[in-house]
Amino acid sequence: MKNDVISPEFDENGRPLRRIRSFVRRQGRLTKGQEHALENYWPVMGVEFSEDMLDFPALFGREAPVTLEIGFGMGASLVAMAKDRPEQDFLGIEVHSPGVGACLASAHEEGLSNLHVMCHDAVEVLHKMIPDNSLRMVQLFFPDPWHKARHNKRRIVQVPFAELVKSKLQLGGVFHMATDWEPYAEHMLEVMSSIDGYKNLSESNDYVPRPASRPVTKFEQRGHRLGHGVWDLMFERVK
C-alpha cells in the first residue's frame, strides 16, 4: 500500500492546488491486527491511487449502486452499512493507515465482498479516479471542523469541493454530511444552498433527522449522553 496523501486548496477555477490539507496526519502506531490486515487483506480490498478512472463494475464484479464514503475513521459505520446493504457497493477513502487497517480487518471478519478502500486524499481521488455521474451517494461524516476562524479555509466542504461531488453523483444521487459542530453545520448549509443543481432534502430547508441508514458511532453516543447535538444534511443532485 502506497502512502502518498496530499490535500489541495482550489484556485478560482476550482482546480486543486497542492497546498492546504483538510486533515492532519495522525498516523499513530499500527496494532498487530491492523498491520496483519494491511498486509493480507489490502491486496484483495485495497485500491491503489492512480490517474486512471475506476471501472466500478469491473472493481466489484457486478453492476450495482455505488456509495463513496470520505474519511471513514476506523471503518465501523462503513462496514455496518456494507453488511446491511449487500445489494449495494461501497468505496471508502481514509488517509490514516490504522483506520484503513481496522476497516479491512472488520470487513474481512464480516466476509464482505461489496467494500473496497483507499488510503489517499479524497479530492485527488475524485478528480482522477471517480467517473462523472457514477455515484448513488457520497457520505462525509464528522469531518475535521477546523474550529479556529483562521483555519476555516481548511474545511473540506467548500463550494469547489461540493461542485466536484455533484459532478460525480448521478442525477438523483445524494450528498450526505454529518457534523457535531454547529458552526460547521451552518457553514455546510450555506455552501450547499449556494450551489445550483442541489436540492435540500430537509422539509424545513436546513437539517434532516439522522436517517436509519447512518449508524450511530460510539463517539456520537457519548456526545448524546453529554447533551451534544449532531446535524445531518442531505442534498440531492437535481440537474
UniProtKB/Swiss-Prot annotation:
Highest taxon of source: Bacteria
Active site: D144
PROSITE patterns reported for this sequence: SAM_MT_TRMB (PS51625)
GO cellular component: tRNA methyltransferase complex
Binding site for substrate: K148, D180, T217, K218, F219, E220
Claim: Methyltransferase is one of the keywords in the record: yes
Pathway noted in the entry: tRNA modification; N(7)-methylguanine-tRNA biosynthesis
Pfam families noted in UniProt: Methyltransf_4
Keyword Nucleotide-binding (UniProt): no
Catalysed reaction, written as an equation: guanosine(46) in tRNA + S-adenosyl-L-methionine = N(7)-methylguanosine(46) in tRNA + S-adenosyl-L-homocysteine
InterPro entries on file: SAM-dependent_MTases_sf, tRNA_(Gua-N-7)_MeTrfase_Trmb, tRNA_methyltr_TrmB_bact
Renumbered residue ranges of the record's region Interaction with RNA: 150-155
Signal peptide: none
Chain's role: Catalyzes the formation of N(7)-methylguanine at position 46 (m7G46) in tRNA.
Record's subunit section: Monomer.
Family affiliation: Belongs to the class I-like SAM-binding methyltransferase superfamily. TrmB family.
NCBIfam families xref list: tRNA (guanosine(46)-N7)-methyltransferase TrmB (TIGR00091)
PANTHER family documented for this protein: 3-DEOXY-D-MANNO-OCTULOSONIC-ACID TRANSFERASE/TRNA GUANINE-N 7 - -METHYLTRANSFERASE, PENTACOTRIPEPTIDE-REPEAT REGION OF PRORP DOMAIN-CONTAINING PROTEIN
Name listed for the protein in its UniProt record: tRNA (guanine-N(7)-)-methyltransferase
